Swiss-Prot record:
GO terms for cellular component: cytosolic large ribosomal subunit. It comes from Streptomyces griseus subsp. griseus (strain JCM 4626 / CBS 651.72 / NBRC 13350 / KCC S-0626 / ISP 5235). This is Large ribosomal subunit protein uL22. Part of the 50S ribosomal subunit. The gene is rplV. This protein binds specifically to 23S rRNA; its binding is stimulated by other ribosomal proteins, e.g. L4, L17, and L20. It is important during the early stages of 50S assembly. It makes multiple contacts with different domains of the 23S rRNA in the assembled 50S subunit and ribosome. The globular domain of the protein is located near the polypeptide exit tunnel on the outside of the subunit, while an extended beta-hairpin is found that lines the wall of the exit tunnel in the center of the 70S ribosome. Belongs to the universal ribosomal protein uL22 family. GO terms for biological process: translation.
Length: 115
């Protein structure tokens, strides 16, 4: 049994989001929620929301209400489209600013031996 959740077009750079996702990959779901709650990175908020959604999907789709018996089997961040902006500089020049977006995916599954 596995349940997945995905958040797309999140305005956080993929590199920063991957730092947070690497923290929780392979953890128990409740332990990962606690880690994300106290993580100082700003990307921990959207990753936490995706994890909560994956746990809720497991409860809804499979009547799997016990979150402590779920483990994060997959968690990854893909790069979304980049918003391009320009900052005016001296003598008619302009610097390009890239505002990157992320697609965050979390898959939870039941631990081995539990149903």
């Amino acid at each position: 049994m596995e349940a997945r959740a995905q958040a797309r077009y999140i305005r956080v750079t993929p590199m920063k989001a991957r730092r947070v996702v690497d923290l929780i990959r392979g953890m128990d779901a409740t332990e990962a929620q606690a880690v994300l709650r106290f993580a100082p990175q700003a990307a921990s908020v959207p990753v936490g929301k995706v994890l909560d959604s994956a746990i809720a999907n497991a409860a809804h789709n499979y009547d799997h209400t016990d979150a402590s018996s779920l483990v994060i089997s997959e968690a990854y961040v893909d790069e979304g489209p980049t918003l391009k902006r320009f900052r005016p500089r001296a003598q008619g020049r302009a610097y390009r600013i890239r505002k990157r977006t992320s697609h965050i995916t979390v898959v939870v599954s039941s631990k081995e031996g539990t149903r």
